[in-house]
Amino acid sequence: MGMFSFIKEAGQKLFGHKEIENAAAAAASDASAQANLDQLNAAAAKGIATYIESQNLGVSALSVSFDGATGAVTVEGQAPTQDASEKVALCCGNVGGVQSVNNLLAVSEPADESEYHDVVSGDTLSKIAKEYYGDASKYPVIFEANKPMLSHPDKIYPGQKLRIPAEA
């Protein structure tokens, strides 16, 4: 799937990304600080992997790494569908402190990729559906495409990236 950009300050608060950023700055000139950074990166990657697994997307051989200096996540493994692969990328990227996701998941059932939308202040799923599909009443398509990460159609926030599937 490739590389996706995200808004670093938006998203789930799974780990202390400011602490990791400070450790990354210190690690440039200090070996013990580098060891601390490695531990923080591993803990962040584990938190992201646990979040992905909690979504029950059917991914096997999941491997997640995080680089606190750049805010980059790399995710590898086997996804059963294109939808699952895209949802994993969103699980990784819609986390505070993550700026980019390199999605290297292999997909068992490849399909066309979805479009993506960055939520801005004032957006609603109805407004987004009107923009992409020409019909505000098609917001459930977007909601379903972003479940289980979205628990309710009204629980979107500025900076969040959403999947916009092709119109069925």
Regions found by a protein language model. Give the residues of each.
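Serine/threonine-biased, Pro/acidic-interspersed low-complexity stretches characteristic
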Residues: 5-11, 131, 161-165
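Extracellular LysM carbohydrate-binding repeats and other cell-envelope/extracellular binding modules
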Residues: 91, 95-112, 140-168
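Primarily a LysM-type cell-wall glycan-binding module
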Residues: 69-74, 79, 108-136, 140
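Secretory N-termini
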Residues: 1-107, 155
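Extracytoplasmic/periplasmic, Sec-exported soluble proteins
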Residues: 36, 40, 80, 117-120, ...
